[in-house]
Regions:
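Acidic catalytic/metal-coordinating carboxylates
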Residues: 62-65, 86, 101-105
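Non-catalytic signal-transmission and effector/linker regions of two-component phosphorelay proteins
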Residues: 1-32, 47, 71-87, 149-161
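Charged docking surfaces used in two-component/phosphorelay signaling
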Residues: 44-52, 64
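Alpha4 helix (beta4-alpha4-beta5 surface) of REC/receiver domains from two-component response regulators
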Residues: 104, 126-146, 150, 154-157
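Short hydrophobic/Thr-rich beta-strand motif most characteristic of the beta2 strand and flanking loop
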Residues: 54-61, 69-70
Length: 161
């Protein structure tokens, strides 16, 4: 998919229009968006959009990398007498990734008391009712199709407290 996207869609077509995504994303001070996607194209688009939304973020390349980073952020928060919600505003994850997929990442987050209340948005090129049902079954707070910046911005705003 990655190679096809790069062939059929020049990189300048993947520019995020600030007018379409809207105003700054309001995150709690000191928090970030933790994002996971193995696709270079998708990571680039997510980074562009989060920059336009003025949202601090950390980007990872797999569910496992995101899970490890999330646990490290939680440990750092706990060492300061805080919770992970003082460090991470939400997790944005792809579904199909090496090492750990987005379903497993989401399930791990939602089943852990340590991450209670942490919103998870699944951002995927996979569609269809079976995937959307599975997204709900693992407890994701939102689902949005890839490559539509304004839909992602709207979904992030909807799930943020």
């Amino acid at each position: 998919v990655e190679a096809i996207l790069q062939m059929v869609s020049p990189s300048d077509e993947h520019q995020v229009d600030p007018q379409k995504v809207g105003a700054k994303l309001l995150l709690r001070p000191g928090t970030i968006v933790l994002a996971a996607d193995d696709s270079f194209v998708a990571r680039s688009l997510i980074e562009q959009e989060l920059k336009v939304l003025q949202a601090p973020y950390e980007m990872t390349k797999s569910g496992k990398e995101a899970w490890d980073r999330l646990n490290a952020l939680a440990a750092a928060a706990e060492a300061e007498g805080k919770t992970v919600l003082d460090k991470v505003a939400l997790v944005l994850t792809d579904l199909e990734m090496p090492e750990m997929d987005g379903f497993t990442l989401t399930r791990n987050i939602k089943q852990s008391a340590r991450f209670s209340g942490l919103p998870v948005v699944i951002h995927s090129s996979l569609s269809g009712s079976a995937n959307e049902d599975h997204v709900r079954s693992v407890g994701a707070d939102g689902y949005v199709a890839k490559f539509v910046a304004e839909d992602l911005a709207q979904t992030l705003r909807q799930v943020l407290p």
